[in-house]
Amino acid sequence: MKIAFAALALGAFAITASSSTSATADEPFEGRVVAEAKLDAAGKKATIVLKGKDASTYINKDYPAKCSVSIAEGGKLEKAELKKEDGKYEDAGKEGKAKSLTFTVGADKSITGECKIVACSDSSCSSPFKVTFKSN
């Protein structure tokens, strides 16, 4: 009987411990990441920057971030789908985390779109979510 009780208690502890060290966070990350897009003055390319609103929010470098981009009517867009490999990360000095992720795409008119990413704090990461952007 003591062995059965000990096994039950140990099992309950293991379940509790594993749920508290989950890789995804209970804290909301969606409002802590911004996406900024800007068309250059020459009207030849657009830059999209994804970053945390504060220094404690990071972009997860291990998640395959991707963006869907559309251009204003009559405009020319170099690429409508951007992947992680198309971007450049600004390293945060923490394994798997970046301060920002920047994409550059050829565009001659304003762009809009959304990016699917994972954000992290020092202790946890979000589930994948989308952020939207619109350039000048």
Residue ranges and their predicted role:
Residues 2-3:
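Bacterial Sec-dependent N-terminal signal peptides
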Residues 24-136:
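Extracellular/lumen-exposed scaffold segments
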